[in-house]
Design a protein with these regions (language model features):
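Active-site nucleotide-donor binding segment shared across nucleotidyl transfer reactions
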Residues: 230-273
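A short beta-loop-alpha structural element at the N-terminal edge
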Residues: 4-17
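Helical scaffold of the NTase/Pol beta-like nucleotidyltransferase catalytic core
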Residues: 200-244, 405
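Active-site rim helix/loop that mediates acceptor-substrate recognition in acyltransferases
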Residues: 18-21, 25-67, 72
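Conserved acetyl-CoA-binding loop-helix of GNAT-fold acetyltransferases
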Residues: 85, 90, 96-109
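Catalytic cores of NTP-dependent nucleotidyl/adenyl transfer enzymes across multiple folds
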Residues: 316-405
Length: 405
């Protein structure tokens, strides 16, 4: 570190800092990120602790930052005010140089004696070096009363009250909020990789049965994707994995299909087959179908994997390996993003209702439901059947919602 200065964040650099946060967290814990929006909301909240929100400046340039908010330990009707820390970010090209550690140590020293504790969700192996201990040692649980190894505490006084940790609502952002905020930044592709904690921002289960069924199927799909280890297989040959279709747009309903596009620098069939061999050899794998489209204008290889989940339900992973930089690079990812932008809560429910009413033996591509509802206002199964007679299946395949109007 050269000429490192830790100082309060300045309003004039808020946007630059949000860009830095977005860059440093992108694809780290889930496809894309939400930390830049969390900080944006935190600044206008009543819980931010501005004197502990520091910027790291190195050689006159922003290199990172740290943010604190007020939180609480709740014990019955009693509430004890504590601090929570995060996010902590360091510019991508300045990481692993001690800047993040310097921010943490500096702010913890500033907070000492002012609050009883700093409580966070984090990795014990990393944060232990700064004096954080398992919150369970102090009788502190999550908001639901469960002991959680990821809840850590840096005690600032000798007496720490037990109870349930409540980080407040400032850290809770919805996928819709994140997408809207992201529209104010340069577009950037979201990827899946094996090191991510989540394949979608974690949200509580919906109460409405239709929405719960979709939420639960997506949750199960994410577990299948993780348990199958296909991400590790693609990463072993440098593949960049993107979600498309209903899995990416959170519109899964009944069919256990996961659509993925994988971008590689070349289409080497033997190399890909070797990379996928551990997946193929799994006792959970039923079969693999391969289609060679490398010589077509689509420049792709299709790998259709059938496998069982832990409950012996059959899933299909439709993995399309596409030549990076070719004509179709990013096309369906853009469609999925546009569908999510266009599908508000009521529109989403109409799409899911049509999918739910669709007979199991009738194979209809998900994009048809989306086009029928979003573009043409279809609201019932009868209307959808009429609409489908007037719109041959190949027409929706070339459709993308207009989100600019």
């Amino acid at each position: 570190m050269e000429n490192l200065i830790l100082r309060p964040e300045r309003p004039s650099e808020y946007r630059e800092m949000e860009e830095l946060i977005r860059d440093s967290f992108w694809d780290k814990y889930c496809p894309g990120c939400s930390e830049h929006l969390v900080v944006h909301k935190m600044r206008s909240s009543g819980v931010i602790v501005p004197e502990l929100c520091l910027a790291a400046e190195e050689n006159g340039e922003l290199a990172g930052g740290i943010w604190y908010a007020k939180a609480a330990i709740r014990n019955g009707e009693t509430e004890y005010e504590v601090l929570t820390m995060g996010p902590v970010c360091v510019r991508s090209d300045r990481q692993s140089r001690g800047i993040g550690a310097a921010l943490i140590r500096k702010t913890l020293s500033l907070a000492a004696g002012r609050y009883p504790a700093v409580i966070i969700y984090g990795n014990p192996a990393y944060y232990g070096r700064f004096g954080f201990r398992p919150a369970s040692d102090f009788g502190i649980t999550d908001a639901d009363g469960n002991l959680c190894p990821a809840i850590l505490i840096a005690p600032m006084t000798d007496e720490i009250p037990g109870g349930a940790f409540d980080e407040g609502t400032v850290y809770h952002v919805t996928p819709d909020e994140v997408r809207r905020f992201d529209k104010t930044f340069p577009p950037r592709r979201k990827h899946y990789h094996s090191g991510q904690l989540f394949f979608a921002p974690p949200t509580p289960p919906p109460e409405e049965p239709l929405l719960y069924a979709s939420w639960d199927l997506h949750r199960r799909a994410a577990k299948v994707l993780r348990d199958s280890r296909v991400l590790e297989a693609w990463e072993s040959i440098g593949g960049k994995v993107c979600g498309v279709g209903s899995f990416r747009s959170n519109l899964m309903m009944k069919h256990r299909d996961i659509d993925l596009h994988i971008y590689t620098k070349n289409l080497d069939v033997p190399r890909t087959l070797e990379a996928l061999s551990p997946v193929i050899a799994s006792a959970k794998t039923i079969g693999l179908c391969y289609i060679n489209g490398a010589g077509t204008d689509e420049h792709c290889l299709e790998w259709h994997l059938r496998m069982l989940d832990e409950d012996e339900n059959e899933w299909t992973l439709d993995m399309i390996q596409i030549l990076a930089g070719s004509r179709y690079d990013g096309m369906m990812e853009d469609v999925a993003e546009a569908v999510m932008d266009a599908a508000g809560p009521e529109t989403r429910k109409r799409i899911l209702a049509l999918k739910n009413e669709c007979p199991d033996d009738l194979k209809i591509c998900g994009i048809e439901f989306c086009k029928a509802v979003i573009a043409d206002g279809v609201t019932s199964w009868r209307q959808f059947l009429t609409w489908r007679e007037e719109n041959p299946p190949e027409t929706p395949m070339n459709w993308k919602p207009d989100t600019e109007g």
